[in-house]
Amino acid sequence: MTQALPDSFVRPAIISDVPFLGDMHATTMKATLAAALGHDLPAEVSAQLTSEALAKGWSDSISAPPSPAYRTLTAVEGAAIVGFAAIAPADQAMIGDAEDNPGTIEILALEVPRNNGRKGHGSRLLAAIAEFAEQDKAEEMQVWIMVGDEAKTRFFQGAGFAPRGIQRNLDLGTGTVTEQCWYTVLDPAE
């Protein structure tokens, strides 16, 4: 006899999700930064990336987003929160004039901890993001990926994203990590 899998879905994040988002974000961010550096994070950087500090930011984002175009989503399996994503209008200064890049949605975060990976949660989050981008009449989606984050690079490349040709560096005290901007053009509504 086989056991049915619990329901998996994506929904808008709610305030009671905040502690989970803070924990998840701290864990995934520390791991990604350490991998990009090739060594442990400097103590002062690690001390800033606490679950509590990140949860405060997510609480503000959920309870008082700057506009309706800012969204935070939660992936749920059964009753457990297993991932999250956040989107906002892209910073036009990074991608050029608005008339050259109308309606670009930036994926600020799309995180599924390794222990919940490979179950479709990331794909469900990305599909929900694409639906919101379509509602907002966006023509592109973009995301910043740290050089060396092969899993995230493969995920977004497999979803049709490609390098935009823009990068930025983050100084972490004992080293610098580089992020590359990846993007995809959305199919026009029929």
Would you name each region that the model predicts?
Residues 21:
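Hydrophobic pocket/interface hotspot
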Residues 24, 136, 158-159:
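Structural motif
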Residues 113-115, 119, 147-148:
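Active-site acidic-Proline motif in GNAT/NAT acetyltransferases
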Residues 143-153, 171-173:
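Conserved beta-strand-loop-alpha-helix junction that forms the acyl-donor binding cleft
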Residues 133-145:
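Conserved GNAT acetyl-CoA-binding A-motif
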Residues 3, 12-15, 26-36, 44-115, ...:
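Acetyl-CoA-dependent GNAT
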Residues 156-166:
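Conserved acetyl-CoA-binding loop of GNAT-fold acetyltransferases
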